[in-house]
Regions:
Chain A
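Transmembrane alpha-helix boundary and packing residues in multipass membrane permease domains
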Residues: 27, 102, 132, 136, ...
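Generic hydrophobic transmembrane alpha-helix motif, especially the helices
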Residues: 61, 95-96, 105-172, 200-202
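Glycine-rich helix-loop "coupling/hinge" segments at transmembrane-helix boundaries
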Residues: 123, 136-138, 166, 207-208, ...
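Hydrophobic residues within alpha-helical transmembrane segments
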Residues: 22-25, 76, 88-95, 118, ...
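Gly/Trp-centered helix-boundary motif
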Residues: 1-94, 98, 102-103, 110-113, ...
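Alpha-helical membrane-protein architecture signal
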Residues: 4-8, 64, 72, 76, ...
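Transmembrane alpha-helices
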Residues: 80-96, 186-218
Length: 339, 329
């Protein structure tokens, strides 16, 4: 088997991460080629009266909006804009998080206290109302201000996690060795500390992208974005504003919402995969084993075979494990004198 | 310093940051908010414009420092000025009308989601690899659904197609009057079912996943194995030994997630036209009602900080180590 193939089989460890990666890859593909393959101009309002809020058909696979615009085309452009924004925010905010987290742990003392306080304060202040406040004051609302504002508020969680990890690594022997051999501070950070935090930074990046998608869609839904551009949030904004719901035009508001949910799910799955890669305990075990006709879970005490005579079904066994009887099963010696 | 005092100091700092950001944001942003308000609402009295300048900057109101001190005084007396879109209603009375709706709805459903999710997480972690555990990826899909989108679908299916439950507004204004009477409370409950269901469904998976992960780690601890070896009943090992300890990180996560849940609930209220603070915020945004936006931001922040403080007290109750540290110092 080829090397990349083996990596692919071993790396994601679980089907969850694979499904997540494939799903996200599909959306990434849609984002890249979407604007080239979309059948219509997403803003073109077809004047044909039979195409106003038309159900899905062969010409319009996802139907049309109230003004005769093609929903599929809007969706394809919208996925691109949303993912583009989320990835940019992810890169900027994660870079800031690593910078703050590593600096804070590496410097220690006053700067550590100060930077930790700042990130904790940002964590505890609810983000969305603050985002709304910031964007509300801007005279021009577009992609760039949204990216800046989301990045400014998106780094504290990652910084906290990175700081904790750096504190742990900082005291390891190999860092001490690097210091003794006269390495400079930035070199230790870049070549000794950060490579040991790659999986953590990756998880933090995925989380930030997830946050950026949720927040940008919510902000667009509230109307705090450039409403002339097509993102998943603005499609939902127009669908809500033009009564798609009351008129029963599900093909208009369901696809963008499902797209957001699927992108989100793929990222959560990816993150779970990364988590399980780092912590084998969290990986799904095979569940209960059947020993002498009775289901034994990994958390159960090692069974004494002589007592496993009474065989119980799935539900019966589960309920029984909570009952007083199970206590006697597990503590009484084979003879059962204690009863 | 005792744990609670330390936390109190931290929340004081956080509140101060929020208040100060609220003061400087309108001054730092490009454009003059007061002028755009005056242009939009020409009926404002000179007094009101003066008050706006004090709040949002611009105009001649003395040094920045003296403006800041006056502003702080106003915040501490809950004087948020008069609303510009519904002039001359005070902002604080608009807040007073809407806060109870959001507080009851979001508070109750968040607690339900937390308890339910934690309970299911305990079972999923204990029976690691069981059917509940394997259903988690499906639940993650629900978690990734934006609150407001699930709300859209529920309004369409349950409210419009099936007519099972009322949607829109917080109570039936034609047949009931607000107050402590049975028809009103019944109507309000009926209107709250769908929004509450939305919050519970979308946030439960997060609690469940986190609790399951901590639970799995806790079960591997020696004291849990020891408890099992002693022959304690499974129920006692699960709840008194494993779950009680696994609950501590869960509670800390709860504190941090409150802001997130509230944010989601705000946008969800818009879909249900629920008369809470989220709908008020939307109206404020769409009508450039800056004083109202600022007041809402502060009120939400204070509420989240207060909720965090309550969570900290619960942590003190559950974690004897926190109490012990206080005694020793």
């Amino acid at each position: 088997m080829s090397a990349p193939g083996r990596v692919w089989r071993n790396l994601p460890a679980k089907a969850k991460a694979k499904v997540g990666a494939v799903l996200f890859g599909l959306f990434l593909l849609a984002a890249v080629i979407g604007p080239q393959v979309m059948p219509y101009d997403p803003s073109y309002a077809n004047p044909d009266p039979s195409l106003l809020m038309a159900r899905p058909s062969a010409q319009h696979l996802l139907g049309t909006t109230q003004t005769g615009q093609d929903v599929l085309s809007q969706l394809l452009v919208g996925i691109r804009l949303t993912i583009e924004l989320a990835l940019l925010v992810g890169v900027i905010a994660t870079a800031a998080a690593v910078l703050v987290g590593v600096t804070s742990a590496f410097l220690g003392g006053f700067w550590d206290e100060f930077l930790s306080l700042v990130s904790n304060v940002f964590l505890v202040i609810p983000a969305l109302p603050l985002l709304i406040l910031l964007l509300g004051y801007l005279p021009q609302r577009g992609q760039l201000p949204t990216i800046i504002v989301l990045s400014v508020l998106g780094w504290p969680w990652g910084a906290r996690v990175v700081r904790a990890q750096t504190l742990m690594i900082r005291n390891r022997d190999f860092i001490a060795a690097a210091r003794e051999s006269g390495e400079r501070g930035w070199r230790i950070i870049a070549f000794d500390i950060i490579p040991n935090e790659v999986s953590l930074i990756a998880a933090s990046f995925v989380n930030t992208v997830l946050y950026a998608i949720g927040a940008s869609v919510a902000l667009a839904f509230v109307g705090l974005t450039d409403l002339n551009s097509w993102s998943l949030g603005t499609i939902l904004y127009w669908a809500q504003g033009q009564q798609a719901l009351q008129l029963g035009a599900w093909w208009w508001f369901v696809p963008p919402g499902v797209a957001v949910a699927l992108i989100g799910t793929s990222l959560v799955l990816l993150n779970t995969g990364i988590d399980e890669l780092g912590s084998p305990r969290l990986r799904a075990t095979r569940g209960a084993a059947r020993i002498a006709g009775r289901r034994v879970w990994p958390t159960d005490p090692t069974p004494v075979l002589a007592q496993l005579t009474a065989s119980r079904g799935r539900l019966g066994g589960f309920l029984h494990s909570f009952s007083r009887g199970s206590l006697l099963d597990e503590t009484t010696p084979a003879g059962g004198e204690l009863r | 310093m005792p744990f609670i005092l330390r936390r109190l100091a931290f929340y004081a700092v956080a509140a101060w940051v929020a208040i100060t950001a609220n003061f400087f944001i309108p001054r730092a942003m490009p454009g003059n908010p007061v002028q755009s308000i005056v242009a939009k609402y020409p009926t404002l009295t000179p007094d009101a414009i003066k008050a706006l300048e004090l709040m949002l900057g611009g105009g001649q109101q003395g040094s920045l420092w003296s403006q800041y001190v006056t502003y702080l005084g106003h915040v501490f007396t809950f004087n948020f000025g008069t609303d510009v879109a519904q002039f001359p209603t005070p902002v604080s009375s608009l807040l007073g009308q809407t806060i109870p709706w959001t507080l009851v709805l979001v508070g109750v459903s968040t607690v339900i989601a937390f308890l339910l999710g934690t309970g299911l997480g305990i079972l999923a972690g204990w029976r690691h690899g069981g059917w509940l555990d394997r259903s988690l990826p499906g639940l993650m899909f629900l978690q990734a659904v934006p609150y407001f989108f699930l709300a859209l679908v529920l309004v369409d299916v349950v409210g419009i197609e099936l007519h099972w439950l009322p949607t829109g507004t917080g109570y039936d204004g034609r047949t009931t009057t607000p107050g402590w009477n049975l028809p009103f409370i019944g109507s309000a409950l009926q209107h709250a079912v769908l929004p509450a269901f939305t919050i519970v469904i979308t946030s439960i998976a997060g609690w469940m996943l986190q609790m399951r992960n901590v639970m799995i780690t806790t079960i591997g601890e020696d004291y849990v194995v020891a408890a099992q070896a002693k022959g304690l009943p499974a129920r006692r090992v699960i709840y008194t030994y494993a779950a009680r300890n696994a609950l501590l990180p869960q509670l800390q996560g709860f504190g941090l997630a409150i802001g997130f849940v509230v944010s989601g609930a705000l946008v969800m209220e818009i879909v249900f036209a629920y008369p809470g603070i989220g709908l008020l915020l939307l109206n404020a945004v769409s009508s450039d009602d800056f004083p109202l936006m600022q007041a809402i931001f502060l009120v939400i922040t204070f509420t989240v900080l207060l909720a965090n403080l309550i969570v900290d007290m619960v942590i003190v109750f559950f974690d004897p180590r926190v109490r012990a540290r206080e005694v020793h110092r």
